[in-house]
Regions:
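Active-site-proximal alpha-helix that buttresses catalytic centers in soluble enzyme cores
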Residues: 1-207
């Protein structure tokens, strides 16, 4: 057993097929890219963890359980790699606050950032989402994220603004649980003369 691990931390999902195709695919890529490290999994949603345990007898650690397991296994280096899109409540309270309690218990325990932090991160995401599909001006392309009550939810507004600045006027960003919500996006789309709407997820996985 190696003394170096990468702990891939996701919100989690109770949909088994979906989990394998999304979180599982990310974990597989990380595992293949860093062969000197053992890849391990943790979820931040205790509700998802409980459902999987009760329904499927599938045990998945939360962050604290994963770190306790690493300590028991004699691990010295733990790289925390979140799959979260932004530094919202899950990232701060479920990951950073938990990891802070273990700073002195490992030789090295760095925390990677979520997807959207720097302007370059936004540029990369825009390049990715606008390169998928060939949509004309008659088509509104709507991306929906989960959303968050945290201040970091502003990433969606920033992303919308940068898309407009780059001339992607038919691209719209909304959220399921925050702002801009369904009604906000619908109002924006109605301002255009579109014949077709394409709805896409801006999230890693369904919950």
């Amino acid at each position: 057993m190696t003394d170096k691990i990468i702990l891939v931390v996701s919100f989690g999902t109770s949909y088994n097929n979906n989990r394998a195709l999304t979180i599982g695919a990310i974990e597989k890529d990380i595992d293949e890219a860093f062969p000197d490290y053992e890849m391990r999994r943790a979820f931040t949603s205790q509700m998802v963890i409980n459902i999987l345990k009760k329904r499927d007898d599938l045990a998945i650690d939360n962050v604290e359980e994963a770190l306790e397991r690493a300590l028991a296994d004699g691990v010295k280096t733990v790289i925390i790699q979140p799959t979260h899109i932004m530094n919202g409540t899950e990232y701060h309270f479920k990951i950073k606050d938990t990891v802070d309690k273990y700073i002195d218990k490992f030789e090295n325990i760095p925390i990677a950032e979520p997807l959207l932090i720097s302007d370059e991160d936004f540029e990369d995401l825009i390049a990715s989402i606008t390169s998928k599909g060939d949509y004309d001006d008659d088509t509104a392309v709507v991306f929906m994220g989960h959303g968050s009550p945290a201040e970091s939810n502003m990433v969606y507004t920033k992303l919308q603004g940068m898309l407009k600045d780059k001339g992607f006027d038919n691209y719209y960003i909304g959220t399921v649980e925050a702002k801009p919500d369904y009604d906000d996006v619908l109002a924006m789309v109605k301002e255009g003369d579109y014949k077709k709407i394409v709805l896409k997820p801006l999230m890693v996985v369904a919950g």
